[in-house]
Amino acid sequence: MAEALKQYWYLAVALVAVAIFTVWVVKKAAEAAGRTRAEREAQMKKLEYESGVRKEFAELSEEKLRSADKKRAFDGVAMNIQRYLEKQSNMNAAFAELPDAKKQIYALYYLFDDSQKGLSEFFKCNSVPLTPEALKAVESLFPRDAAEAFAGEYRAYDPDDETASLIPAETEKNDEKYAQAMKNFDFYNAAVEFIIKNLNDFC
């Protein structure tokens, strides 16, 4: 046997290589299966959460909004607007007919989500009609520095504004300014207070 291995050493090397490769493939397959399972579970939790908050906040009252978890309340209101728009044959036309308060809450929903990686991500992902409505909401609800940073990027990303240019250094500066201003700002509480103030538009 030893003599055979000496004579055909390359076969032994090949067998070892195949064994190592097989272990590697099995390990990668297990990791991929784990990721897929985790992603599927996360998606199921997300869908369950969305369904739950839509039902919970299908009907609104000041008492319900004040006593509720503010994130759930905001998400529920925004997701019900989203569900309504999805059912329309022309979403842009339906959005244009919404009360201003609903437009702004819907825009804020996307702003809060898309800006987690930076304010500029919101502008990269969205345009008219969401961005003007987000601007209105930000100017009335957010801290001054956040509103200034938002307005700066709004102008920079506006193709019709010839007085502003998209300069990467300025974008980074505004992203940082916005992030700092929002650190201690209770976004969900401010948004829910806005909904309560304009409750007739949501009922």
Predicted regions and their residues:
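Extended, alpha-helix-rich binding/interface surfaces that flank or overlap catalytic cores
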Residues: E31, G52-Y106, F112, F123, ...
